[in-house]
Curated annotation (Swiss-Prot):
Source taxonomy: Bacteria, Pseudomonadati, Pseudomonadota, Gammaproteobacteria, Alteromonadales
Protein encoded by which gene: trmL
Gene source species: Shewanella piezotolerans (strain WP3 / JCM 13877)
Gene Ontology MF term list: RNA binding; tRNA (5-carboxymethylaminomethyluridine(34)-2'-O)-methyltransferase activity; tRNA (cytidine(34)-2'-O)-methyltransferase activity
The protein, known as: tRNA (cytidine(34)-2'-O)-methyltransferase
Domain of life: Bacteria
Binding positions for S-adenosyl-L-methionine per the UniProt entry: 100, 122, 130
Annotated keywords: Cytoplasm, Methyltransferase, S-adenosyl-L-methionine, Transferase, tRNA processing
EC number: 2.1.1.207
GO BP annotations listed: wobble position cytosine ribose methylation; wobble position uridine ribose methylation
Catalyzed reactions: cytidine(34) in tRNA + S-adenosyl-L-methionine = 2'-O-methylcytidine(34) in tRNA + S-adenosyl-L-homocysteine + H(+); 5-carboxymethylaminomethyluridine(34) in tRNA(Leu) + S-adenosyl-L-methionine = 5-carboxymethylaminomethyl-2'-O-methyluridine(34) in tRNA(Leu) + S-adenosyl-L-homocysteine + H(+)
Amino acid sequence: MFHIALYEPEIAPNTGNIIRLIANNGCQLHLIEPLGFDLEDKKLRRAGLDYADLANVSHHKNFESFLKAMQGKRIMACTTKGSRPHSELTFQQDDVLLFGPESRGLPADIIDSIPTEQRLRIPMMSTSRSLNLSNAVAIISYEAWRQLDYSGT
């Protein structure tokens, strides 16, 4: 299956929703520290309901340790600054979908380190800034899973 990575997530309920999501689609979640909340946060647990035991979650102390763990995998920067719509990419089994923090998105240096053709965006109205993080993760991860014929079901 593929991987979902959250770079310095800030809002516990969003991460909780994503934990519930990955329990349902079989992805592995990577949380890249620092986190903007405590993992024991009530809002995180409430949003994730009882899915935490079904979810595969890894923690990384920083971006460098995350990159080391993902060595050899294709990383997609999921950003409003993406060069192409997410639906134009042909996803592969071990791809990594990397999302930035809610208030600021991925830093420019991280975006710049990823090949242009691997910088994905979700099409939206020109008057909008962004989508909610957990919604964006759902949209892109389910498109990737669809392309992989819902493997694992």
